[in-house]
Curated annotation (Swiss-Prot):
Alphabetical list of CDD domains matching this protein: AAT_like
Name the record gives this protein: Aminotransferase ALD1, chloroplastic
Cofactor (UniProt): pyridoxal 5'-phosphate
Expression (tissue specificity): Highly expressed in senescing leaves, flowers, siliques and seeds.
Source organism of the structure: Arabidopsis thaliana
Top-level class of the enzyme under EC nomenclature: transferase
Pfam families named among the record's database cross-references: Aminotran_1_2
GO cellular component terms given for this protein: chloroplast; plastid
Length: 456
């Protein structure tokens, strides 16, 4: 039983107008020509102005305006590029067409998701792990589920995140009111425990040095580092959570890329059902980034400090804030989990894995220190002594390639770039050639290039 406590008192989501910076009010009045008497949510005031991916998009557009005739290649945001297998889309198409008939029309479904799909998810991904279909909550994607889980957690909990980490964990925590203000000097939010995960600790936090928090956000395979936690490490994490009465929010969105037998689910670890919620997605697994389909697992054994089942509260939140995933998307999800669908999906994922290998071989040959990339689509490339946004700009300006600055994932990401294996093969090959030409002709200018590479 976890010792997480929730309070019924309302969180301070608003304050007097005098606490709103004058510059912010001036901005609103200038943009709108006036204002209401509604006071802005003070938690939104805490957010940094530039969320990572919109800022990358802004710089990308500026670059296109500056260089309108060049081919820009993205090795950046983790969007899939290959077509969804026809076997899956035809099933979705047939279902959609059926909506135009009396026999095939379907309206609202269960907020928790189609029963057949929930059963298929439990049997496909959690066979022999004791996950039941009633514990599966089908959604419109993992990122949406993270926000709904924040509604469950509330503003009075303490949180820990890997550093570097996927930005949505922290930003959603800021919005719900779990954090203090952002410190420019440390690049950290108050009231958040940042767990360093880098080469010095095999990208797994030193739990002996980690203070207790109510909630631990943990992603494996990790975005952005590309590392997957070993079975031994996840045993340590579960034991740590049980000792402290904490809940783990385990993000397994990239589990399909694991190749070495490492755990694909936190529930492979004994005792995890008592302390962990798992969030996952069809986005990277099946190329559903635009279709939008995911799921969360809330075990029956997961309880509040007073013994009340957490699954009951999450069900209430889902039925209040969500009318269920698209029935067309859910039809596609069922097709994905058929034997033929799984075979086609594996073929597409192998394509991305080959892309990743091409990029890995290229970067290693250049003497760069490359981490990750074995059980995930992402490479985590170290540029020692350099600011990640500076390296991002330098590569963009000279090669017309988009990457992702590591500092956007937290202070532990400074000096790194995330490079993605998602992309068309011809773009991956062309990008590799450009990177080779760029670094080979400029080696003497870069202190972060070494004669030996360091890969995992």
């Amino acid at each position: 039983m976890v010792s997480l406590m929730f309070f019924s008192s309302a969180s301070p989501l608003c304050s007097s107008p005098s606490k709103i910076p004058k510059a912010s009010l001036d901005f609103e009045m200038k943009k709108l020509g006036g204002s209401t008497k509604l006071v802005r949510n003070v938690n939104l005031e805490k957010l940094k102005n530039n969320y990572l991916f919109p800022e990358i998009n802004r710089r990308e557009l500026e670059h296109i305006e500056k260089h309108p005739n060049v081919q820009l290649i993205s090795l950046g945001t983790g969007d899939t590029t290959e077509p969804i297998p026809e076997q899956i889309t035809s099933h979705m198409s047939n279902f959609a067409h059926g909506l135009s008939t009396v026999e095939g029309y379907r309206g609202y479904g269960l907020e928790q998701g189609n029963k057949t799909l929930r059963k298929a998810i439990a049997e496909t991904f959690y066979r022999d792990l004791h996950v039941k279909s009633n514990e599966v909550f089908v959604s419109d994607g993992a990122q949406s589920d993270i926000s709904r889980l924040q509604l469950l957690l509330g503003s009075n909990v303490t949180i820990a995140v890997q550093d570097p980490t996927f930005p949505a964990y922290i930003d959603s925590s800021v919005i719900i009111g779990q954090t203090g203000h952002f410190h420019e000097k440390t690049k950290k939010y108050q009231n958040v425990v940042y767990m360093p995960c880098g080469p010095n600790n095999s990208f797994f936090p030193d739990l002996a040095m980690t203070p207790r928090t109510d909630v631990i956000f943990f992603c494996s395979p990790n975005n952005p580092t590309g590392y997957v936690a070993s079975r031994k490490q996840l045993h340590q994490l579960v034991d740590f959570a049980k000792t402290n009465g904490s809940i783990i929010i385990f993000d397994s969105a990239y589990a399909a890329f694991i190749e070495d037998g490492s755990p694909r689910s936190i529930y492979e670890i004994p005792g995890a059902r008592e302390v962990a919620i798992e969030v996952s997605s069809f986005s990277k697994f099946a190329g559903f980034t635009g279709v939008r389909l995911g799921w969360s697992i809330i075990p029956d054994e997961l309880l509040y400090s007073n013994g009340f089942p957490i699954i009951n509260d999450f069900h209430r939140i889902v039925t209040t804030s969500f009318n269920g995933a698209s029935n067309i998307a859910q039809a596609g999800g069922l097709a994905c989990l058929s034997s033929g669908g799984l075979k086609e999906i594996r073929s597409v994922n192998n394509y991305y894995k080959e892309n990743r290998k091409i990029l890995m071989d290229t970067l290693v040959s250049l003497g760069l220190k490359v981490y990750g990339g074995v059980n995930a689509p992402y490479l985590w490339v170290h540029f020692k002594g350099s600011k990640s946004w500076d390296v991002f700009n330098e590569i963009l300006e000279n090669t017309h390639i988009i990457t992702v600055p590591g500092s956007g994932f937290g202070p532990g990401g400074e000096e790194y770039l995330r490079i993605s294996g998602f992309g068309r093969r011809d773009h991956i090959v062309e990008a590799s050639k450009r990177l080779q030409n760029f670094f080979n002709t400029r080696t003497k200018h870069f202190t972060y290039l070494s004669s030996t590479s360091n890969t995992n």
